[in-house]
Every structure is written in C-alpha cells, then in structure tokens.
Amino acid sequence: MTLRLSRRAYAEMFGPTTGDRVRLADTELLIEIERDYTIYGEEVKFGGGKVIRDGMGQSQRVAADVPDTIITNAVILDHWGIVKADIAIKHGRIAAIGKAGNPDIQPGVTIAIGAATEVIAGEGLIVTAGGIDTHIHFISPQQIDEALASGVTTMLGGGTGPATGTNATTCTPGPWHMERMLQAADGWPINLGFLGKGNVSVPQPLVEQIAAGAIGLKLHEDWGTTPAAIDNCLSVADDTDTQVAIHTDTLNEGGFVESTVAAFKGRTIHTYHTEGAGGGHAPDILKVCGESNVLPSSTNPTRPYTINTLDEHLDMLMVCHHLDPSIAEDLAFAESRIRRETIAAEDILHDLGALSMLSSDSQAMGRVGEVIIRTWQTAHKMKVQRGALPEDNARNDNFRAKRYVAKYTINPAITHGIAHEVGSIEPGKWADLVLWEPAFFGIKPSMILKGGMIAMAQMGDPNASIPTPQPVHYREMFATRGGALARTSLTFVSQMAADAGIAERYGLAKWIVPVRNCRNVTKADMIHNAWRPSISVDPETYDVIADGQLLTCEPATVLPMAQRYFLF
C-alpha cells in the first residue's frame, strides 16, 4: 500500500527533498536540494511508532558492522554539494553518506543500523562541517567556548594569553611557550594548532619552533616584516612542510607591496588581512589577490561593509596595536588602515571568489564567535546589492552558498595542511559536524559534534522533566568531560615535532596530527574561491580596480542575522 504525500507534508515529516528550497535564517539566500540519497517510502526515523525499531529499520548486525551514530534525513551544505542524506559516524569519523536502514528487509541501504547505533534526528536540519578559524590571537581561553558555540571546531593561530605581544600578533614565540600552549590544548574540546614567531633573518630560531610543535610561522609587521625576514621564514617553511601566515608592512617601511611579493619568490603563503582595514601595505595590499602563490584571507570586523564599520575601527585599532591617540604618528598609522573604498571592494572580492578565506582575528580587531554569522551576512549583502551570481539562477543561490561555506571550512583546511582530517563532510574525515535549524542557520547551532560525540548543545533546565524547558542555552556535553575530551579533539603539529616524539615528551593526552602538503598549495586549490584579478588601488582616492572594473558598493544600513536573534 502506498500513500502520496504533499511536498509540505513530506518536508514536515522527513525534511526537504530534491527540488525543495530552504531559506538560510532571515537572509535572501535560498538553497535547493540537489539530490536525495534516501528512498521514498523507505526513510528511517526514530521515535514511538516510527521506523528504527528491532526487525524494522534496525537490523541484527553487531557493532563492528554498524555505525556508532547516524544523523537521519539531514540536509548537507558543503563545498561539494547540497544534498539530503543519512550520515554515518564510526570511531569518531564520518563513515558514510547515504541511505540508512535495515538491509535485510529494505532496498538500497548503504548504512546498516544496529543495536550499537545511536540516532540523532536530522529531519529539517542543515548540517555543515565544523568551522575553521585560522586567525586566532590566543588572548583568553574563554574564546574557545564562544567559538565552539558558534560552530567553529578548529582554531589555528598563536599567543600565550593577554601579553602585549599576543594582543597584537598571532605568535606563540619559542619552544618553551610552544610546549606550554600544547599542554594547555589538552584541556579544551576543540582542535588546536599554534604558529611560531617568524620574524627573524636566520633559520635556527624558526626551526626550533617548528621542532617544538608549531604548525607554521607567523610574520607580523609589529615584529618587523622585512623582505629578509620573509625570505628566511619561507625558506624554513619549505624545508619543514609548514605554512607561513603574514601580516604585511602597513607603513611601507621595509618596502612596498611589490617588495613583499618579490620576497615571496613564488612560494606559497597565507596572507592575513588581504583586506580593507585589517592591516598590511597601505593602501594596496589587495593587489596580492592576483598572485598564484598567495592564499588570501580577510577578517570579520569589516564583514560586511556597513554604515558603522568606519566608526568602530579607529578605537579598536588603537587598542589592539598598542598605539597612543595623543601621538600624531600613531594616529596617522591607524587612519591609514581605515579606508571605506577598500573595505567596500573587500565585499565584492569575497563575492567573486578573489578572497578565499574568512577568519576572526579574535579579540585583536575581530570577534571569535562571529566568523560564521559575518560570512553569511556578507553573502546576503552581495545577493541584495549584486543579484544572483552567473553560476546561480532565479530559483536558488547554491553556488554562492558553496563559495561562502568554503571560506571557513575546506579552504582554511587546505591552506594549513589539515584537509585530510577536517574541513568538509566526507567519509574518512573527523566527525566535526554542526547541526542548524534553518531559521537559526549561521547564528545559533542546535548541536555541535566533536569527533563524533556531542560536545555542546542548546539544553534546557537540567532539573526539568524533559530537555526543553527554559532557560535554554548552550551547555557543554559529555565530549567535553574526562578522558572523552582527549579522544574527540585533535592537536595539530608539524611532522618534525611528531617524529621527535613531543606527545610523549610533553605528556600530551590528545591525539597529535601532523600537518602536510602545505607547500604545494596554490590559489587554484582554493575551492570556489580561486579568482586572480589584476588589481590596482589609486593612492589618492583609494578606488579599487580589478580587471578594469571599479569595485564599489554601498554600506549596508540593516543586516539579517542580527538583533532579532539576540533579544535574550
């Protein structure tokens, strides 16, 4: 016996299917399901009178033959597609994406459910890969709580706490600090990796930081990003297969942007603040977006350009870079970095895929819990101001959604040599997954999984008779407790450090994972974000021209994903 359901009734029961569209939060962005891996009439769902019961949707197979957890009927939004599927998790990793059920009685089953299988209901939810923030100033450990609650599951950067150096630069300097920070990483339910200080003109001080566990090196103008330091740092990175991140010379003291590009010598580098106000060669750091060896990112304070952006930045910059507003030279330095024209161009360069990544710059001119929000606010603003992308159509914004989700998931992972473990929803990868109700997409996740275990979720009063009574807020779950913490999160280190046995020497509890393939990455590897325009910036008007076109847009006066979500 069959029963024909309306699309609405089907979506309410099993979630949207092929051809259905979903609005992302209160934005103008619509995604459309491209494929449904489930089979109509054979869907699995847990609950009283539902399918996943013994002899029905649940098989008799033993634990070795079934996943530890399945997420049923979820909409997956990732760089590779927008699909409806069941997701299987086994031993902390994504085991399969397909059709779950009982293969003994159901057709087309690719994921067998057994008595050893836990179920997370994904009906009506969107699942994304955990976010990766590659621009972290480790100023306070409480940032990790904020980041995790926002959907970020990997944090890369540097620092030692609220030291003056860390307040301004993302460096964990020297072997002693590196060891202490790696030991501290054991206490937090998030994947972590640390950058050493790259500003020195001879190799050994850099090599010893890589050997101590750094995943890469950070060049920052506040430590002196000279051509000699750049050249030396990249040479060490080439020898150790680690990445270099750079914040270039705002004052153009050691040379102009052309001097910095020349010092790269065609070698791969992640350019932080390839943007309109974050820092770097004034006013034309945006030029580096056209270089094949440059992997460009920007940070979230200027995302997107609004009527309040300029006013906010001056005081923020004075504090972060230890400047004195009573000193004329310090004030001039700050004002040189805040340019409405280049901030506006940054919006468009993100939309066209010239800027490949987006990160926070946490507590140092950036908000650690707003990477995902501001990414999608930028996408919305560009949809409203510029219309559909050529790759999209009147029905959906699928390509734009894939482009923007890649900016904080797969592209940072590729850049820093961790894409073999995290950054996308693909079999074999660590099960760092974020579940969203569509109305709250990008703003407030329903649940965050780390290594296949629930790490944080919206949870009601623990003394209530059911999980939902107020006050409902984010609470840490069992993946953050006891020995489970060290088995559901990763610490990234260099291959040199892993080979040297730092895990045993430092007494680390978390699994350590070496970064790899950092030096052969090019802009062409930045998924959906590989455009290399020829850019010029007028030194007087700051107008930005890319491939002959003036890049300009109006500041937003109102944004989605904002106050209506934060009334309480």
UniProtKB/Swiss-Prot annotation:
Residues 130-568 form the Urease domain. The keyword Ligase does not apply. The modification N6-carboxylysine is found at residue 218. Binds 2 nickel ions per subunit. Substrate binds at residue 220. The active site is at 321 (proton donor). Belongs to the metallo-dependent hydrolases superfamily. Urease alpha subunit family. HAMAP family: Urease_alpha. This is Urease subunit alpha. The lineage of its organism: Bacteria, Pseudomonadati, Pseudomonadota, Betaproteobacteria, Burkholderiales.
